[in-house]
Amino acid sequence: MNLSASGVSADKRYYENNEQVSKPADFMVDSYDLEFNFRNDLNAVATIKTDDFKDEYKFTLYHGYKISKITDGNNDELDFARDSDYLTIKNTSKSKLIKIYYHGSCDKYYSNYLSVFLPGNFAFYPIPGFNEMYSTHSYAGFDDLSLPYETDFNVTVHSLKKVQCNLESSTNNEFKGKSDSLTLLSGFINCVTINKTQIYYPYFNDAYNSDTINEKLETFVSKNPNIKKIFIIPDVNLEDIEFVKTFNDYMITASIDDIDRLGFVSKISANKMELYDAINAYMNYPEYFEFLKTNSSEELQKAIPVLEEILKNDNDGKKLEKINDYLIDNADDRSFSEFLCELRWLYVKA
């Protein structure tokens, strides 16, 4: 584990020099049976049941994890090809059950006998399809690879320390449940409960105690009853887009200050963060907004005059609501200018 800035930035250099691929899966995962052994690094066995037989299965698994072997449901070995984060399995046995044995580490998202930080946005277990793991937009960092659906997880962890998980614990370090992702965390962790929501926090950090957490999170928890657990994670060389992530029923965050805003920001994809930054600058930091007019991407510079015109005439806040909807709609792939020009025209006609 190398938590220095140079060690963690190795991923940024890696993805700047290695092409990423996006190819949606043509199957779904019915269930994960995951076994993790934390010693000097991570050793894992992932047993995956798919919803349909395929001649070939494609998965994404972080390149720092090396594959020892892959077998089918009868423990017969299957051929596979590995290229960076991308794994292709030749399913010659016509099985819907696949077992992947792997080991390794990641500097940023570490896992060893002392502590574990494996968040749900990170492919530390095989994710269906080929996915772009790391954003190389203006806001760089590991993007969200949670599933677009919930599936069954059965997780067993072998560790010298107690491990916390977004799933419910059946026995010590064993977890079960349905989710769109998996998060594992261990170290010096305490837990406080607010209105049935469990908040896990590092007790060695003086910024966090039960009183402070209650004060800053009570309102947020009451407004978001779907959030069952909140994990306050270590801010160790995290990029902006890694700072907070919201999943179906839990949240990970490196701060609890201004948690409502952070919760909203966590839903914005990396390719739209630059527009959010410009909106925030217009509303709160006018000098920085002027700076962005000539010191930002070509796409944002083209969009800024339209954005400024819209916000200047947004007396009732309805245009900002439309912009916020666009920011968190990952299916809306219009460019900044396309969206803003259409929004301006919509209100001109009205």
Map each language-model feature to its residues.
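Extended, low-hydrophobicity, Ser/Thr/Pro/Gly-biased non-transmembrane segments
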Residues: 4-7, 103-181, 299-302, 313, ...
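A surface-exposed beta-strand-loop module
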Residues: 64-118
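Pan-zinc metallopeptidase signature
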Residues: 313-350
